[in-house]
Regions:
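Flexible N-terminal pre-Rossmann segment of NAD(P)-dependent oxidoreductases
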Residues: 7-11, 65-78, 252-253
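An N-terminal boundary/leader segment
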Residues: 1-60, 64, 282, 286-288, ...
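Structural helix-boundary/capping segments
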Residues: 21, 40, 117, 121, ...
Length: 484
């Protein structure tokens, strides 16, 4: 079979693997097509490293396998990108910050190793918000630069996993890995029109297979996790199955689903975004999904008591431990902070360094976080809910220039609010509770900017959440390729 370039670019991860396993598509041809795509779209700054030689060599090894050997590899010949804060053997891991530029780990992070063992090919490292400490991916580090949204290169892709999301949306790769602390897989997935999973944190088996704190440049051991991102829910489920060791997944039965709509996360939205989100709700309801309004009136207040204290307390010790364990070029947090290039990240680290024990961390971890987790558990149980559903962000992607020298944005002309409040408000509570979250496309604002919906599930219910996502995707559809 002969594949055109356009046909190759439109392959989902699942479709690409099936074609390569069947011998219908050579891995070398596919990788060459995607490498050319990456080079042609270098203006997006989606990647910090493009491994041309390594990717082609890996593709040649896949093509040299017999048909039976390829069939045994669940990701045979699948090109992926890995966020630049996740350790990759032989490829720079800099967290897109100057002090770590040139650092090359000697071992893959466990999640990366599982993908490679399954036949995946590392195309390169994905750009990101510097040190993962932000939600725009507007990076001023000279070796990185600001990531641009493929739907409109003058707008942010979201962050901090903006490079992974931009690369997937731009058809540079069909799938990849990001990380998520407060929303960093889900926010860029929403703004770029793709799918992103934040796995459960605290669910020992799943978390250990996804996340090794010594193999990912950290922010918070309580909240950090690696997460898969892809063009479709099936693609994300495929990567999740490889990493966790689970088997194939079928869509949930739509007519049996009870989905909660948490009132606090449906308030204060951009009007155009809310219209798209509510149109999606109507489609789900028409398909037989039962939608249940839930109050959760304490949600945001409880989250505030947890989030600030953790954000001030954990980064210093966690980053210091990673620097020492990895024999990094900079051996102190102060040494890393002194060379931070992005003003917003420098300000954040100045605050952390000035008051590393700020906030009531003990109270947050022993009282308020358990109460937040209890609120979620009671909400799921009391209403018999399978998941919660809400817009991933309060507004669509804003122009990059709007954030230059400012960290405040306006929603429909209202008084400006902090960018973190605008983009993190809806994703952060699940992060602090440790429950899984799945962002998937709901549609487009003005036919040009993606809107995402997020499904949050009970702790440890990742595979059930993905099954619901498969069912919802069949109703809502996926987004077309952006016109770049």
């Amino acid at each position: 079979m002969t594949w055109t370039v356009d046909q190759q670019l439109e392959l989902s991860a699942t479709q690409a693997v099936e074609a390569i396993q069947a011998g219908q598509l050579k891995a070398t041809d596919y990788v060459a097509t995607l490498l050319a795509r990456a080079q042609a779209l270098s203006n997006l700054n989606a990647l910090t490293v493009l491994d041309v030689e390594g990717a082609l060599a890996a593709a040649q090894r896949i093509d040299a396998l017999g048909a039976n050997e390829r069939a045994r590899l669940p990701l045979a010949g699948l090109p992926v990108v890995v966020k630049d804060n996740i350790n990759t053997r032989g490829l720079q891991t800099s967290a897109a910050t100057p002090a770590l530029e040139g650092f090359v780990p000697t071992r893959h992070a466990p999640s990366v190793q599982r993908l490679v063992d399954a036949g995946a090919i590392l195309l390169g490292k994905a750009n990101m918000h510097e040190l993962a400490f932000g939600i725009t991916s507007t990076n001023l580090a000279p070796h990185a630069g600001p990531v641009r949204n493929p739907w409109d290169p003058e707008r942010i892709p979201g962050g901090s996993s903006g490079g992974t999301a931009a690369a997937i949306a731009a058809r540079i790769v069909p799938a990849g890995l990001g990380t998520d602390t407060g929303g960093s897989t889900r926010i860029p997935a929403a703004l770029c029109g793709i799918v992103g999973l934040r796995p459960s944190v605290g669910d020992g088996g799943t978390q250990r297979r996804y996340h090794d704190p010594q193999a990912v440049v950290p922010i918070s051991h309580t909240r950090d996790t690696v997460g898969p991102m892809g063009r479709t829910v099936a693609d994300v489920a495929l990567l999740d199955a490889v990493i966790t060791g689970h088997g194939p997944l079928s869509p949930a039965a739509v007519t049996n689903l009870r989905i909660g709509l948490p009132a606090p996360l449906w308030e204060g939205l951009e009007a155009a975004l809310e219209d798209v989100a509510r149109t999606a709700l109507a489609k789900l309801e028409a398909a037989g999904v039962t939608l249940v309004p839930v109050e959760m009136s304490e949600l945001l207040a409880l989250n505030d008591r947890v989030s600030y204290a953790i954000a001030l307390h954990e980064p210093i010790e966690d980053l210091a431990a990673w620097l020492v364990a990895n024999h990094a070029p900079a051996q102190t947090v102060a040494g890393v902070a002194a060379r931070i290039a992005s003003p917003d990240v420098r300000a954040a680290y100045d605050a952390v360094l000035a008051d590393a024990r700020g906030g009531d961390y003990h109270g947050a971890m022993t009282m308020w976080r358990p109460r937040l987790q209890q609120l979620y558990a009671q909400t799921f149980a009391a209403s018999g809910l399978d998941a919660l559903l809400f817009p991933t962000t309060r507004l669509a992607a804003v122009p990059i220039d709007e954030l230059n020298g400012s960290s405040r944005v306006s929603i429909d002309g209202a008084a400006p609010i902090d960018e973190m409040e605008a983009y993190l408000r809806n994703t952060d509570p699940a992060s602090n509770a440790g429950i899984p979250g799945l962002a998937l496309p709901a549609g487009l604002v003005d036919a040009c900017l993606p809107v995402g919906l997020e499904l949050d599930g009970p702790a440890g219910g990742d595979r059930r959440l993905l099954a619901i996502g498969l069912a919802f995707e069949a109703i809502l559809g996926t987004l077309p390729a952006p016109e770049i």
